[in-house]
Regions:
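Alpha-helical bundle regulatory/interaction domains
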Residues: 1-172, 176-178, 183-188, 202, ...
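Extended amphipathic alpha-helical scaffolding segments in membrane-proximal extra-membrane regions
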Residues: 176-177, 194-198
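Catalytic-pocket segment enriched in acidic/His residues
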Residues: 189, 193, 201, 205-221, ...
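A secondary-structure capping/hinge motif
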Residues: 197-201, 245-257
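Residue-level "edge-of-site" marker
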Residues: 209, 244, 260
Length: 271
């Protein structure tokens, strides 16, 4: 597996976490990989063979060749049909709203073809240019030109949304929304509405995902730590609360997470 990340143009750095590429040789017996929520939105281009996305049991669909994956609140499985070669743009929680004309709640928990978001002709040209590019740097240049042009035509995300996310990130999801709005409690409904439109999930849900991400980093980078310590470091009420949230978003308990064959891909994103 070859996973690499690349930094965005300074004018996009506040909206894009990174670009990343993934290359995996074809296998006669590929393992399904469990993808877990991370609070970000992805715009991905499949350059290699098709990838299955399991919907239930043995039922699957093929992921679109170019799509946006909205916010997710539960794990799902993917499986390559051959060799993997992907290029992706990873947006911060509020980042993609600056380029979209639809409420982001309509993108949650699914892959949406970019043609549905940018129009058939625009999407076709973008996808063709990405595929025909000879290397990753060329792809970054192409997608950045597209995004910078589109950014100029789109309104920005509200300050209340940005400040709420900044607080959640700064505290690893350990601040209640009531505490964030303690000086303006009447804005709770407004915030919920704006989150649905610009993020795709509620502020409380995003906070839970961010806190889980903090716990995952500790779990993966400090192997050997007991679960009580990880729960304490991540500010969960207790170990039971930590395990409950962990299973909700990953579908597996923390002890089984490390080294699990279905977690190889998700684990790579934390190294």
């Amino acid at each position: 597996m070859n996973y690499q990340t690349f930094q965005p143009h300074p004018n996009l750095a506040a909206l894009i976490s990174c670009y990343w590429t993934l290359e995996v040789p074809a296998s006669d017996h590929p393992d399904r990989q469990r993808i877990i929520p991370d609070g970000k939105i992805e715009m991905a281009f499949i350059l290699g063979d098709n990838i299955k996305r399991y919907t239930s049991g043995q039922q699957f669909i093929l992921q679109p060749r170019a799509f946006v994956l909205g916010q997710t609140l539960e794990p799902f499985y993917v499986e390559p049909t051959g060799s993997v070669n992907s290029f992706s743009v990873s947006f911060y929680p509020y980042g993609f709203a600056n380029f979209a004309d639809v409420p982001l709640k309509t993108l949650a928990n699914k892959e949406t073809p970019i043609s549905d978001l940018f129009g058939e002709e625009t999407a076709r040209k973008l996808e063709q240019h990405i595929i025909e590019a000879s290397n990753t740097q060329e792809r970054i240049t192409i997608v950045e030109k597209f995004l910078l042009n589109r950014l100029n035509q789109t309104t920005t995300v509200d300050t209340i949304v940005k400040s709420t996310i900044a607080t959640l990130v700064a505290t690893n999801g350990n601040t209640s929304i009531s505490n964030i709005l303690k000086k303006e409690p009447s804005k709770r409904r407004q915030l919920e509405r704006k989150f649905a439109e610009k993020i795709g999930i509620s502020p409380k849900q995003l906070g839970k995902v961010i806190r889980l991400q903090s716990a995952l980093k500790i779990l993966l980078n400090q192997e050997g730590e007991n679960l009580t310590h990880i729960a304490y470091e991540s500010n969960y009420y207790d170990q039971a609360h930590f395990i409950k949230d962990f299973k909700e978003f990953t579908g597996i308990n923390p002890k089984d997470f490390l080294g699990h064959k279905n977690m190889e891909l998700s684990s790579a994103f934390y190294k």
